[in-house]
């Protein structure tokens, strides 16, 4: 598939392979459609953007790099939902889970980001973890604060030692 996709992307990178859907994940976010947040729908449409061959090709290339291992060189925190849910036309089914990505794939490949990765599944979190319902969002901020409390003193200590050397 990757060879075919690469070839197609060279000649038809703007070809649309999936059009925006009615409703979708955005309805679980935007306040006019049952969500909690107000944002510019031109920047993040409810049904997403058209998916093009070039976009899928770029994603696939990035995934292949990830599968080989990246090591981003810095500690990283990966917060994700604890489960995947189906994307539906209404927001109710997407309130408590990731309706965009397969979280089992995130769990499988997160360790390839670098040697200092912390992966934390957040119960009932949405795809955009910090846009989740209040309870999982509070858990996510708590985990972020704990991670920063753990990491920042180490980073400051290393910086100070490096400057003194």
Language-model segments: which ranges?
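Conserved loop-alpha-helix segment in the C-terminal half of the alpha/beta-hydrolase fold
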Residues: 77, 85-121
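Short, glycine/serine-rich, charged loops/turns that create anion-binding
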Residues: 83-85, 126
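Short amphipathic alpha-helices and their capping/turn segments at secondary-structure boundaries
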Residues: 11-12, 63-73, 108-112
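Conserved active-site and cofactor/substrate-binding residues in soluble primary-metabolism enzymes
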Residues: 50, 54, 101-104, 139
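Active-site nucleophile elbow and catalytic-triad environment of alpha/beta-hydrolase enzymes
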Residues: 47-69
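Catalytic active-site module of serine/aspartate enzymes centered on a nucleophile-bearing elbow/loop
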Residues: 113-165
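Short beta-strand/loop motif that positions the catalytic acidic residue
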Residues: 72, 78-80
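Alpha/beta-hydrolase-fold enzymes
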Residues: 1-50
